[in-house]
């Protein structure tokens, strides 16, 4: 009897050891998957490049394109990134994802370096900032769009074949756009911090542009789509107060100049409680940056500063399901904000969680939510759960990042990826031929858009993988940029 007990005990312990070993191996596999996803997330930006591609271009199915952008205005507007799955360059979302790429480079510099991706991450950022510098040729002039959104969307063409009009649109003193100028100022200021350790001269150039753009945004108030009306149907801004706070917060972090902190504390409001962080709504970002100052003890956490911090933490509490207005979750556990490209909001919110986890750790602080406390580790655990969902731990067992695992979207809504590469067939694909032969083709895309994150599933965790479903199948840099930082944080 005792021998039986001993044998059973040994069997039990053997079973436990096997289970623990399997779990540890699975955990290691996930960890390695984060690193793989991080590498691929940066490859995606190379697939989005416009202009003359560099000799070290790794996404070789793409070719040079849009080499005359800006010629109608006698300005060089080549380079930069295409928007989502089309061939447009929309300055407003472009500037936002540039800011988020910069923030990823800043907060997760150590992790990016450890995974040997810092050089690639900075290269992705510089491809954007080089373009933004060219788009700002005078203190009160900023080019905010290249291409006509309507004609572009009426065609399905490779960027290398484009025959659609490429008009250049700008804002200036007579045609203002405080939101566009403010967001671009934020991008330049944030990028200056990212580049300062390796290229101080370039960082100073960026700071100069950021300061000019911030003054331009303040001096000539206005919503940019009233000046660039073509943008209104695609990326309409809901206001410019958030961009001005966001820009001031980044300029203060980059320069430590009191005037930018004064702007933040003397503003009429802090944005109040927000339900999302996105290319249109930067209040959460500004709130988080000011909260960081308070956590570091660089400013007194009272008055307006305390309000910024409270609003930032209220957003985090709601994401963590411990607030008074919690973010909806799908049955599978995904933070769900809006039906159209929900993952852009999820990755942005998850970046906030990752960054704030770092701030709390450094400050040895926690958050007191209406329904319980949150430690730094809780925030990172929630961020990791969202990453895991996006990379395949979901009811469909599908990775929503292209190229990760074997079950991932094969037909993302993306012109360049869905048409045979120009390196394989140089025969031009016309506007209508693209729709007939490629857009409506039920086959998978001929080019794998490695690292792209699609719009994601609906609120019931269902994803159909149809090229025609642009609300769920279209990837965008605004989704990918914050995800770079999140992946680095959890890798």
Swiss-Prot record:
E.C. number(s) listed in UniProt: 3.2.1.4
A Gene Ontology cellular-component term: extracellular region
One GO MF term: cellulase activity
Main location: secreted
Residues of the active site: 86 (nucleophile), 413, 465, 474
Signal peptide: 1-31
GO terms (BP aspect): cell wall organization; cellulose catabolic process
Record's catalysed reaction(s): Endohydrolysis of (1->4)-beta-D-glucosidic linkages in cellulose, lichenin and cereal beta-D-glucans
Glycosylation sites: 397
Pfam families attached to this UniProt entry: Glyco_hydro_9
UniProt subcellular location: Secreted
Entry keywords, A to Z: Carbohydrate metabolism, Cell wall biogenesis/degradation, Cellulose degradation, Glycoprotein, Glycosidase, Hydrolase, Polysaccharide degradation, Secreted, Signal
UniProt similarity note: Belongs to the glycosyl hydrolase 9 (cellulase E) family.
Protein name as it appears in the record: Endoglucanase 14
Organism encoding this protein: Arabidopsis thaliana
Lineage: Eukaryota, Viridiplantae, Streptophyta, Embryophyta, Tracheophyta
């Amino acid at each position: 009897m005792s021998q039986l007990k001993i044998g059973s005990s040994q069997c039990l312990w053997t079973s436990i050891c096997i289970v623990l070993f399997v779990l540890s191996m699975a955990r290691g596999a996930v960890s390695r998957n984060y690193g793989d996803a991080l590498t691929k997330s940066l490859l995606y930006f190379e697939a989005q490049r416009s202009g003359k591609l560099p000799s070290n271009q790794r996404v070789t199915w793409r070719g040079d394109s849009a080499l005359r952008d800006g010629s109608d205005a006698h300005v060089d507007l080549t380079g930069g990134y295409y928007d989502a799955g089309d061939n447009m360059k929309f300055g407003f979302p472009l500037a936002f994802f540039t800011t988020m790429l910069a923030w990823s480079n800043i907060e997760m510099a150590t992790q990016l370096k450890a995974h040997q991706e810092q050089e690639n991450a900075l290269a992705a950022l510089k491809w954007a900032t080089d373009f933004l510098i060219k788009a700002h040729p005078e203190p009160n002039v900023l080019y905010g769009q290249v291409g006509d959104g309507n004609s572009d969307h009426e065609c399905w063409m490779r960027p290398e074949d484009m025959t659609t009009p490429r008009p250049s649109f700008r804002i200036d003193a007579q045609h203002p756009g405080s939101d566009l100028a403010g967001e671009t100022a934020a991008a330049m200021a944030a990028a200056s911090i990212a580049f300062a350790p390796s290229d101080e001269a370039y960082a100073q150039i960026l700071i100069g542009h950021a300061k000019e753009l911030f003054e331009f945004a303040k001096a000539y108030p206005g919503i940019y789509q009233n000046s660039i009306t073509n943008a209104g149907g695609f990326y309409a801004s809901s206001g410019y107060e958030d961009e001005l706070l966001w820009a001031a917060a980044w300029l203060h972090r980059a320069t430590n100049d009191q005037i930018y902190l004064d702007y933040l504390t003397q503003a009429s409001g802090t944005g109040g409680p927000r339900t999302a962080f996105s290319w249109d709504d930067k209040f959460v970002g500004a709130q988080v940056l000011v909260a960081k100052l308070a956590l570091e003890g660089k400013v007194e956490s009272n008055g307006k500063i305390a309000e910024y911090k409270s609003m930032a933490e209220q957003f985090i509490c709601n994401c963590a399901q411990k607030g008074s207005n919690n973010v909806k979750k799908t049955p599978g556990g995904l933070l769900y904000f809006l039906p159209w490209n929900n993952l852009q909001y999820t990755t942005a919110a998850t970046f906030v969680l990752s960054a704030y986890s770092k701030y709390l750790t450094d400050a040895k602080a926690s958050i007191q939510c209406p329904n319980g406390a949150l430690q730094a580790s809780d925030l990172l655990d929630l961020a990791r759960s969202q990453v895991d969902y996006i990379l395949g731990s979901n009811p469909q067992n599908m990775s929503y990042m292209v190229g990760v695992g074997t079950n991932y979207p094969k037909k993302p809504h993306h012109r360049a990826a869905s048409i045979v590469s120009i390196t394989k067939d140089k025969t031009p694909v016309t506007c209508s031929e693209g729709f007939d032969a490629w857009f409506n083709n039920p086959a998978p895309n001929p080019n794998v858009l490695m690292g792209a994150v699609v719009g994601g599933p609906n609120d019931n965790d269902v994803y159909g993988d149809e090229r025609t479903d642009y609300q769920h199948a279209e990837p965008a840099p605004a989704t990918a940029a914050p995800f770079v930082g999140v992946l680095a944080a959890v890798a």
